[in-house]
Amino acid sequence: MQLDAEALAEAPFRKQEVPQNQENQQKASSSFHESSLTSSTHSHPSNPPPPPTRLHDRSFKPVSKNYESEGRLTPPPVSMGYRYARSSKQSFQREDSGYNDDVVTNSSSHRTPRHHRRSYSPRSDYGSRSPSPHSSVDSHQSRSPVRSRDRDRSSRSSRSRHPSSRSRHRYDDYSRSPPYSSRHSRSRRRYEERSSRSSRAHDYDYEDLRDDDRSHERKRSRSRPRERSSKLSEEERDRRTVFVSQLANRLTSRELYDFFEQAGPVRDAQIVRDKISGRSKGVAYVEFCHEDSVQAAIALSGKRLLGLPVIVQLTEAEKNRKAREAAELARAASAEIPFHRLCVSNIHFNLTDEDVKAIFEPFGDIEFVHLQRDDQNRSKGFGYIQYRNPISARNALEKMNGFDLAGRNMRVCLGNDKFTTETTSSMLKRFDETLARQERSQPSQRNGGSSTYESQDYREAAPLSPTEEESRPITRDELMKKLARSEDISDNSKLVSEPEPPIRSRCALLENMFNPAEETSPNWVQELEQDVKEECDEKYGKVVHIAVVPNELGQIFVKFENADFAEKAITGLHQRWFGGRTIKASILPETDYYFKFPNAKTA
């Protein structure tokens, strides 16, 4: 067969002719797929166009197109019927049984059942599926339309129940194909970014919730301000603690805490309870943060808490500490005062320094006697006596403490005018111990040597109380013997003390004679003086001086011509009724009378 040379030359450039029937069929399938892609894009604009699905049949023979042979530089879209394998090793496989063959993909974990897979071939007008670009017409015509409709209905219901499964499988199956790689990867990244943002937002919400909880815990912890517990010594804690008693049984520690908050910040408040029953014993201890709050807490004593007045006082440990401090201060004060100095109080106001010296000089040599006086040079009733020898001071203290002088019981103590609760006997015992210690330290003084006794040991002695029950007042006989400087001191044991004779005085005191509130006359004082003077002159004896003191006691002072008249007046007026009142009459020493009325001495 001879070929024309011109035909042979044009053969390589001539496009291969396709039969008319096959060409029409390909055009119809291509146009139908384009219309299906357009409708799918409008119905789901957010999803990428689905790739075509091959309907597998035993008679199907895969056909692959080569877009490079058609003169294309880039791959055409999937909608034109092209399909690209993921790798050179992947190929289409057919199953031996079943209506459709599954396509083997790398994402095997997302394999879906056969009845959930979507067929991308659109329906035809006659109820059958249109042939895909890779399938034959005969294979589609042999399938039942009813079975196709059932499969499509099941696929639509599955997509409605699982809206995300379609896109997920689509991305997994076709994300690596050339036409979908870039677009689907960007969609996947956007999806992952949204997921990460939502997870971070959830984490942020959780962190905010935890921060809110922490802030709430901090606020709740700040609702009861407390100091951070520091290591305090027991002495410091005792100084900050008060003892509270007379508390109600139903009182709680919180109520006690709030009550003492008005005195200052409270560190701790503990109610003492029974170990077995747990009931309150009515007492508590409250510890403050600062020592200044203790005095403010003591000021709350007497205020009512749950209807009961509370009693606030220092703890026993604090009381003992204050007692020790007071004793140390007393010893420091006594260290500055010689031990051979005495303090004498409750002395009659008319006695002078010479009178007191004459009374205390029989016990030993006196260096000085000094009575305290006011601005008008009147005695204040107390003073100091200093002996040369502490032994003399000891004897004077033992004998003269409590001695009755001019109607007054004198009080004698050591060193200064600060009186303690120590008795004279205990002081004398301590005095002897101190003196013995002093004599051991100075043996030369035991041989008759003189001593000034200015040692620090004597200065450390604390003053004694002048009011004590164990002291025995010196009798008048003993005092008179000492005053007379009798040499027969050994005969003191033979003397028999006689009862002290009553004080004879010309002065009398009448009490409860009147009531100033009931007197209405402007000259009632002069009138009362005249009435009492006339009655006493007539019944008891001559009155040389009388004075009415307008006070609540109703006192009238009367001085008679002699002591017998005064005693007679006291006997007759005592317990007598006068103006509806009972009179109280008593002898008044003349010294007291003259101290009160100095002009009565010349009367």
Curated annotation (Swiss-Prot):
The keyword Phosphoprotein applies. Keywords: Phosphoprotein, Repeat, RNA-binding. GO terms for biological process: mRNA cis splicing, via spliceosome. Residues 111-120, 156-169 have a biased composition (Basic residues). The modification Phosphotyrosine is found at Y174. GO terms for cellular component: nucleus; spliceosomal complex. Residues 240-317, 340-417, 506-590 form the RRM domain. Residues 18-28, 441-455 have a biased composition (Polar residues). The keyword Chaperone does not apply. InterPro entries: Nucleotide-bd_a/b_plait_sf, RBD_domain_sf, RBM39_linker, RBM39_SF, RRM_dom, RRM_dom_euk. This is RNA-binding protein rsd1. It comes from Schizosaccharomyces pombe (strain 972 / ATCC 24843).
